[in-house]
Each structure stands twice: as structure tokens, then as C-alpha cells.
């Protein structure tokens, strides 16, 4: 059970805690320049650092290890349309350039990604079964990755293929991939980095799906061997946001409990002297800054977030947390029971790189202090802004990864660059105070139009989950195909809806629809910590379904009782809106993810009947654009969800 990994000046031990097996062996690496001999582009001064000191006043000699971290790349090969803090940012080649520059500068480093490297991908990656972004990550010399919820979109067997290599059931569609000794093959070689799954267990064996933790060993400046342990986790609630087939046969454990168990038992596995002296948790769960986010800030200190609750229960030996999932950026410290921890997150789509410095005691191997800086991964000569067209800066891209990007952009171009229609204005995911989104309205309208005919479902209303809407459609965005302003390509539409879900139409009562809408919220104020309504998994702030034009309802997310959050409901009968009574029955369309209770909307699964399957969501979306020609799709008014008196 051995596998060789790219490595920089160290030796890895990958430990499957459940079975105590060594899974990898050492690999020699090129020399690196001293860290103080290279200027890192984009690095900030030490005055911008938040340093967490664990030495308790002790004066000790230390060795620095840099942990380079990113998350939620979601197969973003080409960076078109991504920006942050007024800068065009992200994309695999540009992220790779920054990562490689820092790897070359540091004497000791580890590169990790915190989940969702694959899944919900643009067409150029999704069309080739997530292989391109994995190859790009190999070229970045990523060492370890936590699994994210989207790693399970296609099931654990497909995730194992992503790790180990081999062709997809559709055939060997990628490449050609270079062979180490020369020549090439069209057989996908797998990930050179190791996925970790501390809290994901196979039901049939009780073992973790991937190794529960991995270690990196370095020599301190005084010659002592130092071992750093890396845990890799995903949110425990993954089964509520992934299709049931994606997580079949797996149990997702409490994050803190699983991490603590591994840390506490580590000395009992393998050679005791290889047990980590310092621990880093790489976890696909996160939080948000409150108010206006700052690149290296922590407004609100993650109060009330899922990641804060987990961090507060961690073993004191876990002092550095690389987090993810929320697509937010922050650099925070949280102190619990006298233990202060450093927590980072690097936004999404390769727009930010987190650089965490671990200062480790040369003699004991214990963590003395930790600091971190988030840096924007810029990719253009110009600043971003409304209506501004990006001017790419090739000097900021890694040529090796750019070649991969160019290869797959070209391969997907005949399909990706096909113009499917036009938009009259920007269709965004920006929500009203009650949670309605312009782009969400349009998607729900498209799915209704597809399933309205009696033979295709006879739908009266349609619902869309907000998490399935992955990107905005902006008039000024120009894809590699060079379409005109306002034109929408198939590739852009696919980026908005990349999951390949199919439409399902079911019969529901008015009461079931009311209960469904209540499941959007928690008890008490929407932003509070009350229990979710009717057994749902609604987060703080709610999870508001997007609705078709044929449906209206009154909403008060802050009502104390779940039963009081939804008021009157109306449905269009073909002539006018009429009130929907609890005793009425009607046909309702959703995607197959929602139909099976996804996102905690169990009413779709348990209180609906007579299911009829239908078209794929992307096909419905494309057909809707074509039907709107030549005028194009207008930006809808946000008047479908109205305040409850």
C-alpha cells in the first residue's frame, strides 16, 4: 500500500488510524533557496501579521515551517468573472504561480487544500470529470487535501478514482498525460497529493475512507527531527447537502470528536517517535466575518459560526486550523479555556492564498507561535469594476499550469463558446432582504417552463435551492470565445448550474408547501441559534428557496415560532393569482437533489408523491434562453417573496 508523492525536503507518513498502516514512503526533492534570499510578490510586512504565541514567555530557538493553503477551488481553471476587493483574481495558473514562488523561497513548507477542489465546476473541468483541476493541483505540488462535501458529488467510488487514477466509466476522455520516463498516456494518473478524511468512516469496515491524518517530518536548525501532523475533515452535515447516492455507505462523524480521538491515540499507532509534536487541522467547514469583510480581518470573530463551535471543543494540541466551505476570507484567533488558536480561510476559486508560519521549538518540536497572511491572487493588469473587461497579465501565471488550462479550454471550446442567448442586465445571486435572487428567479422560471406541459409534469410552481446556483451572469463578462457584451455562452450557463441534476415533479398539498417554506428557517430570529424548523438543517440566516413567477408568499423570517414565519400564499391559475389553501393540491417541480431531501428540505421527500422525472437542469436553462430570443432575458423584479404583515 505504498504511493510516492511529490515532496519538498521532507518525508511523509500517511497513517490510517483505524488500521495502523504506513501508506507512503520518502521521496527526494530539489534544494530550495533560503527564505530570506527571495522577495515574495504580494507578501505583507510583519506589521500586518497576527502572531499567536504559545511559548508562555520562554526564550527558545525555533525553526519556521510555512503552510500554504487554499480551498474551494471548484475546478476553476480559467479565472474569467472572478474578482475580489476591486481586483481580478483567481484561476489555477495564477494561484500556481504564487504557490510555486513561495515554495521556492521557503526552506520548509507544506501545501494543503481544504476541500471542494472538485465539484460544482465550470464546463472546462466538469466536462472531463474533474481530471484537469487535479492535474493542475499536482503541478502545484499540493501535499495533502481534506475532503469537502463536493468531493462526494459523484460518490466515494468516483472520489477514489480521482485519488488513485484510471479512466471514468465514460472512457478515457482527458489528456494526453505525460509519463515520467517520456511519452504520454490517455489514462488519468490520479492525484499526487493525499486526501485525508479524519471524520469519514466506511460503514462496512469501520475504517476511515482515506487516511485519518498524515505527517510531515523536517529537521530543525539544531538537527532534531520534527514531526507535524495534518488532520483532514469535512463538515459532519455533508449527508444533508449531497445526494444520498454520493454518501452511501459512509458515516460522517462529529468533527471535534474525531479530531480529538486521532490526536489522543496517535502515539499508539506505528513508531511512537513519529507521533506529531505539532498538529494542524485542515477542515472543510467555516464561518464569515460580520459586517464588511477585510482581507486579513476577523470582524465578529466568527461568533455563532459552525467553525467556532468546533474549534472551542478541540484538543489543546490542535492550535492551527485551516478552514473552508463558506467561500469567505478571514484570519482569526479564538481563545477557549486558556488556549488560543489561529484560524484562516482563503475565499474560493483560487482568489486568495493563505500563508501560515509555524515557529517550532528546535528541541521539543512543539509549536511556539503561529502567524498568517492572506494574499489576493491577482491575474490582470487592470482593476476590476462594473463593466470593466479584464486585461490578463501572463506574467502572473505559471506556464506549466497555464498549458493545462489552455489544453482543456480549447478542448471544451466548441461546446463552451456556443452562444445560447442574451441578458438585458446582470443576473446575480445578490438576495433581497427576504432571500430572493434575480438569477434564482430566472432558474426557477426555466424549470417551470420545462415541466408545465401536462405530459412533462403539469407543474404549477417550481423551486430552486440557492446552493445550486454557482455563479452570476454579468453582461460585461467575456469568455474565451469572445462573445459580444450581453451574450451568454453554454460554458457560462454550465458554470451557473454545473451539477447535472435532473428535474422532478411531484404532487404536494398547500400545507406541505407551507411546511416546506418553514424549513427554510430556524426557530426565533433568522440570524439566531435556535433549532431549525421542522427538522431541517437551515443555517443561521436561513436557506431561502428560489421560486417561479407563478408563486407568491408572505415571509417573516424573524417570527418567534416556525408556524408564524409564513403567511398567505398565492399561485397563478393561468389568469390571475389566487390564494393557495392548505387543503389544495398542486404539481411542484424541484431538482433531484431537493427531491431526496437535500439541504434538509425533507418535506420534498416525505410529503410529496407521484414523482415524474424530467430533463437535466442545464438543458432546461439553455432552452429557456433560446426561447427568450431575440430580446433576451430581463432582470426580474424581486417581488415574489413579500413581507408578512
Predicted feature residues:
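C-terminal region of N-terminal signal peptides and the immediate post-cleavage residues
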Residues: 25-37
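Feature captures C-terminal
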Residues: 38-66, 76, 84-86, 90, ...
Amino acid at each position: 500500500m505504498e504511493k510516492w508523492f511529490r515532496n519538498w525536503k521532507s518525508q511523509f507518513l500517511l497513517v490510517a488510524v483505524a488500521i495502523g498502516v504506513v501508506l507512503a514512503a520518502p521521496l527526494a526533492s530539489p534544494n530550495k533557496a533560503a527564505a530570506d534570499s527571495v522577495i515574495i510578490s504580494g507578501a505583507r510586512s510583519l506589521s500586518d501579521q497576527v502572531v499567536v504565541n504559545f511559548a508562555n514567555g520562554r526564550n527558545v530557538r525555533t525553526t519556521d515551517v510555512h503552510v500554504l493553503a487554499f480551498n474551494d477551488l471548484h475546478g476553476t481553471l480559467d479565472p474569467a468573472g472572478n474578482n475580489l476587493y476591486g481586483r481580478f483574481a483567481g484561476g489555477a495558473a495564477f494561484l500556481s504561480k504564487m504557490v510555486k514562488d513561495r515554495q521556492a523561497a521557503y526552506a520548509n513548507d507544506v501545501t494543503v487544500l481544504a476541500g471542494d477542489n472538485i465539484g460544482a465546476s465550470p464546463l472546462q473541468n466538469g466536462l472531463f470529470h474533474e481530471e484537469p483541476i487535479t492535474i493542475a493541483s499536482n503541478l502545484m505540488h499540493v501535499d495533502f487535501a481534506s475532503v469537502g462535501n463536493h468531493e462526494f458529488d459523484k460518490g466515494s467510488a468516483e472520489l477514489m478514482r480521482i485519488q488513485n487514477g484510471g479512466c471514468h466509466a465514460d472512457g478515457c476522455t482527458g489528456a494526453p498525460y505525460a509519463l515520467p520516463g517520456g511519452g504520454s498516456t490517455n489514462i488519468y494518473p490520479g492525484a499526487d497529493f493525499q486526501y485525508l478524511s479524519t471524520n469519514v468512516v466506511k460503514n462496512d469496515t469501520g475504517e476511515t475512507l482515506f487516511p485519518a491524518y498524515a505527517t510531515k517530518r523536517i529537521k530543525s536548525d539544531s538537527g532534531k527531527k520534527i514531526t507535524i501532523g495534518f488532520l483532514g475533515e469535512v463538515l459532519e452535515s455533508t449527508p444533508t447537502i449531497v445526494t444520498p447516492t454520493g454518501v452511501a455507505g459512509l458515516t460522517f462523524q462529529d468533527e471535534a470528536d474525531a479530531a480529538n480521538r486521532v490526536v489522543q491515540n496517535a502515539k499508539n499507532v506505528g513508531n511512537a517517535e513519529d507521533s506529531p509534536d505539532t498538529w494542524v487541522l485542515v477542515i472543510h467547514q467555516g464561518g464569515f466575518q460580520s459586517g464588511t469583510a477585510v482581507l486579513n480581518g476577523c470582524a465578529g470573530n466568527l461568533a455563532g459560526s459552525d467553525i467556532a463551535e468546533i474549534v472551542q471543543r478541540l484538543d489543546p494540541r490542535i492550535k492551527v486550523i485551516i478552514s473552508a466551505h463558506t467561500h469567505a476570507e478571514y484570519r482569526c484567533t479564538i481563545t477557549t479555556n486558556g488556549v488560543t488558536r489561529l484560524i484562516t480561510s482563503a475565499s474560493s476559486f483560487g482568489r486568495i492564498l493563505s500563508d501560515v508560519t509555524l515557529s517550532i521549538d528546535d528541541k521539543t518540536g512543539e509549536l511556539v507561535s503561529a502567524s498568517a497572511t492572506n494574499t489576493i491572487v491577482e491575474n490582470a493588469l487592470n482593476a476590476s469594476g462594473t463593466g470593466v473587461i479584464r486585461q490578463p497579465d501572463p506574467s502572473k501565471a505559471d506556464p506549466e499550469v497555464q498549458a493545462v488550462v489552455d489544453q482543456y479550454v480549447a478542448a471544451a471550446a466548441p461546446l463552451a463558446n456556443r452562444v445560447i442567448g442574451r441578458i438585458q442586465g446582470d443576473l446575480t445571486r445578490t438576495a433581497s432582504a427576504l432571500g430572493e435572487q434575480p438569477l434564482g428567479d430566472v432558474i426557477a422560471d426555466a424549470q417551470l417552463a420545462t415541466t408545465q406541459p401536462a405530459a412533462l409534469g403539469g407543474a404549477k410552481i417550481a423551486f430552486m435551492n440557492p446552493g445550486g446556483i454557482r455563479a452570476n451572469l454579468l453582461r460585461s463578462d467575456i469568455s474565451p470565445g469572445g462573445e459580444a457584451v450581453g451574450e451568454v455562452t453554454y460554458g457560462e450557463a454550465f458554470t451557473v448550474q454545473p451539477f447535472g441534476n435532473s428535474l422532478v415533479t411531484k404532487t404536494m398539498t398547500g400545507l406541505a408547501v407551507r411546511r416546506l417554506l418553514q424549513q427554510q428557517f430556524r426557530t426565533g430570529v433568522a440570524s439566531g441559534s435556535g433549532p431549525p424548523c421542522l427538522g431541517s438543517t437551515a443555517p443561521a440566516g436561513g436557506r431561502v428557496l428560489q421560486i417561479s413567477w407563478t408563486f407568491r408568499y408572505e415571509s417573516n423570517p424573524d417570527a418567534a415560532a416556525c408556524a408564524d414565519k409564513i403567511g398567505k400564499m398565492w399561485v397563478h391559475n393561468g389568469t390571475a393569482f389566487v390564494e393557495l389553501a392548505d387543503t389544495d393540491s398542486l404539481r411542484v417541480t424541484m431538482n433531484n437533489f431537493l427531491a431526496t431531501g437535500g439541504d434538509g428540505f425533507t418535506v420534498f421527500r416525505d410529503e410529496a408523491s407521484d414523482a415524474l422525472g424530467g430533463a437535466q437542469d442545464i438543458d432546461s436553462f439553455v432552452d429557456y434562453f433560446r426561447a427568450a430570443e431575440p430580446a433576451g432575458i430581463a432582470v426580474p423584479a424581486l417581488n415574489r417573496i413579500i413581507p408578512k404583515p
